[in-house]
C-alpha cells in the first residue's frame, strides 16, 4: 500500500509540474506572438508547432528584405537629383576616354565629367556612378558651341556616314559629349600652315573644342580655355612641363585628323542630293566663294569673363541666359573688308545658330562683309563628327575655298581647304594677313583653285598610306 501511495503522489506531482511548465511556455509564446502593428494573433499556434513555424518563417528575413529596398530608393533619389553637365550613358567610356580621365587626375584637373559621373569614396578615390539608367544630359558648350571631334579609330572606320537630321544630330551629340572638355584640355596640336607640308609635325592634334569651352585660354596658367580640337597650338602655349610629362607618360591614342580624313565614309546618295542651302548668285556676287570658319579662326569666345574681350553679349539657352565674351582675331575686320571685295564670303560654323547668328549680327549687322551664314544644321554628321560638305553651298567647287582651323571640317573637299592655326589671345598673330596675297592670286589666275591649294599646303601628303 505504501508503494502505491508513493507512486500516486509522485504521479500527481509530475502532472502538476508539467501543467505549470506548459502554462509558462504558453504564456511566453503568447507574448512573443503578439503583433506589433495591430495584427490579429494566430489561433492555436502554441507549443512545438508554433516554435517550428517561428523558426522557419521568422521576422529577421522580412526586415532584411525591406532594408535593401529602402536603400535602393534612396540611391535612386540621389542619382535623380544629381545635376551633371555631361551625358551619363550606360556603357563605360572607351579606352581613350578613360586614359584621358586619368591624366586629368594626375594633373589635378578633374573636369566636370569626372566629378559628376563618379562618386567619391571615403579614401578620396573616384568610382564609377552605379546608376546607368539616367537619361543623357548635354553641356551648354556642347550644344551651343562647336562640338569636339570624336575619335575615329579602325574599329569604326567602315561605318556609314550620318545625316543632319535632328534625331541623328542628337545621337551624335551624345557621342561627342563623352569626350567633353577635360579631354580637349589634355590634347595638343601641331598643325601649321607652312608651304612645305609641315602642317602636321608631331601628329598630336587636338580634338576640336566646343567653341569656347568656357575655360580660360591655353596661354594662361590659371582658368585657361580648352584649346580646340585639331587646332594648331604653338609650343609656348602655356602648358607646363609637368602637364606635358603626364601627357606623354600615358600610352593613349591621340586624335589624328588625317587618319580621320583618310577613312571617312563616303557621302550617301541622300546627302549628295541635298538641296543647296544658299540662294543663286546675282550679277553683283563675286565669282569666287570664300568659306570661313568662326571659332578659333576669326574669333575666340568664352563663358568666363575675359578682361580684354572686344565685346560681350547674352545667349538665351534652355531658359537660362549665359554671357559670352568675345575676342577678335588680329586683322579680323581688315581681312574681311579686303576679301569681301573679291570673294563671296560665307560663314560656315558647326556652332548652333542661336549663338553664331547673334554674334554675326553684332559683328556684321548689315551683312556687308559676310553674305551668307551656315550653321550646325547644315553640316553632315559622320559618327559623331560634324563635317562641312561644300556641296550644300550650290557653288562651283573649282572656285570655292574654305579656311578652317580643323582639317577634319573639310574632309570631303581636302583640295579646297586651307588650314589655319587656332587663335585664342595672341595679339601678335598675323595669320589672316599672311593668307591675303595667296587668296588674291587665286582670283587673279581665274583658274581652278584646287591644284594651287594642293600644291601650296600639300595636305594630301599628310594622309596615312593605304
Curated annotation (Swiss-Prot):
Domain spans labelled FCP1 homology: 283-442
E.C. designation(s): 3.1.3.-
InterPro entries xref list: Dullard_phosphatase, FCP1_dom, HAD-like_sf, HAD_sf, TIM50
Presence of the UniProt keyword Phosphoprotein in the record: yes
Keyword Acetylation applies: yes
Keywords (A to Z) from UniProt: Acetylation, Hydrolase, Phosphoprotein, Protein phosphatase
Gene Ontology terms for molecular function: phosphoprotein phosphatase activity; RNA polymerase II CTD heptapeptide repeat phosphatase activity
CDD domains in the record: HAD_FCP1-like
Biased composition (Basic and acidic residues): 60-79
PROSITE patterns the UniProt entry points to: FCP1
Residues found modified as Phosphoserine: 28, 51, 85, 104, 134, 165
Enzyme class: hydrolase
GO cellular component: nucleoplasm
Region (Disordered): 1-140, 220-240
Biological process per Gene Ontology, one example term: negative regulation of BMP signaling pathway
Biased composition (Polar residues): 8-20, 129-140
Residues with PTM Phosphothreonine: 86
Modified residues (N6-acetyllysine): 26, 57
Family from the record: Belongs to the CTDSPL2 family.
Function of the molecule: Probable phosphatase.
The protein's name in its UniProt record: CTD small phosphatase-like protein 2
Amino acid at each position: 500500500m505504501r508503494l502505491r501511495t508513493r507512486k500516486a503522489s509522485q504521479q500527481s506531482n509530475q502532472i502538476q509540474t508539467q501543467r505549470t511548465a506548459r502554462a509558462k511556455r504558453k504564456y511566453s509564446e503568447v507574448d512573443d506572438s503578439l503583433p506589433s502593428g495591430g495584427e490579429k494573433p494566430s489561433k492555436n499556434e502554441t507549443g512545438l508547432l508554433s516554435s517550428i513555424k517561428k523558426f522557419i518563417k521568422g521576422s529577421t528575413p522580412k526586415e532584411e528584405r525591406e532594408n535593401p529596398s529602402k536603400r535602393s530608393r534612396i540611391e535612386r533619389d540621389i542619382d535623380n537629383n544629381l545635376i551633371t553637365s555631361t551625358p551619363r550613358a550606360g556603357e563605360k567610356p572607351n579606352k581613350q576616354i578613360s586614359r584621358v580621365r586619368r591624366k586629368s587626375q594626375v594633373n589635378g584637373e578633374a573636369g566636370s565629367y569626372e566629378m559628376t559621373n563618379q562618386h567619391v569614396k571615403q579614401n578620396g578615390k573616384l568610382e564609377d556612378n552605379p546608376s546607368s539608367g539616367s537619361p543623357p544630359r548635354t553641356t551648354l558648350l556642347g550644344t551651343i558651341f562647336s562640338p569636339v571631334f570624336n575619335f575615329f579609330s579602325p574599329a569604326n572606320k567602315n561605318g556609314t556616314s550620318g545625316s543632319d537630321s535632328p534625331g541623328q544630330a542628337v545621337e551624335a551629340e551624345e557621342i561627342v559629349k563623352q569626350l567633353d572638355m577635360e579631354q580637349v584640355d589634355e590634347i595638343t596640336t601641331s598643325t601649321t600652315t607652312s608651304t612645305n607640308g609641315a602642317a602636321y609635325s608631331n601628329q598630336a592634334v587636338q580634338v576640336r573644342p566646343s567653341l569656347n569651352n568656357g575655360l580660360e585660354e591655353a596661354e594662361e596658367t590659371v582658368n585657361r580655355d580648352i584649346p580646340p580640337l585639331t587646332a594648331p597650338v604653338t609650343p609656348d602655349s602655356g602648358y607646363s612641363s609637368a602637364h606635358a610629362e603626364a601627357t606623354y607618360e600615358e600610352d593613349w591614342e591621340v586624335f589624328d585628323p588625317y587618319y580621320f580624313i583618310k577613312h571617312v565614309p563616303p557621302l550617301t546618295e541622300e546627302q549628295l542630293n541635298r538641296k543647296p542651302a544658299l540662294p543663286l548668285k546675282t550679277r553683283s556676287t563675286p565669282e569666287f566663294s570664300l568659306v570661313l570658319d568662326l571659332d578659333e579662326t576669326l574669333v575666340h569666345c568664352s563663358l568666363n569673363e575675359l578682361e580684354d574681350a572686344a565685346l560681350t553679349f547674352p545667349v538665351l539657352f534652355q531658359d537660362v541666359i549665359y554671357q559670352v565674351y568675345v575676342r577678335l582675331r588680329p586683322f579680323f575686320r581688315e581681312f574681311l573688308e579686303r576679301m569681301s571685295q573679291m570673294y563671296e564670303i560665307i560663314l560656315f560654323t558647326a556652332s548652333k545658330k542661336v549663338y553664331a547668328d547673334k554674334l554675326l549680327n553684332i559683328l556684321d549687322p548689315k551683312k556687308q562683309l559676310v553674305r551668307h551664314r551656315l550653321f550646325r544644321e547644315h553640316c553632315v554628321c559622320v559618327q559623331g563628327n560634324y563635317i562641312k560638305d561644300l556641296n550644300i553651298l550650290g557653288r562651283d567647287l573649282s572656285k570655292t575655298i574654305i579656311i578652317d582651323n580643323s582639317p577634319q571640317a573639310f574632309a570631303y573637299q581636302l583640295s579646297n581647304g586651307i588650314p589655319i592655326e587656332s587663335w585664342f589671345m595672341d595679339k601678335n598673330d598675323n595669320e589672316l594677313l599672311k593668307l591675303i596675297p595667296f587668296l588674291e592670286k587665286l582670283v587673279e589666275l581665274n583658274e581652278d583653285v584646287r591644284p594651287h591649294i594642293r600644291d601650296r599646303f600639300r595636305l594630301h601628303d599628310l594622309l596615312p598610306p593605304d
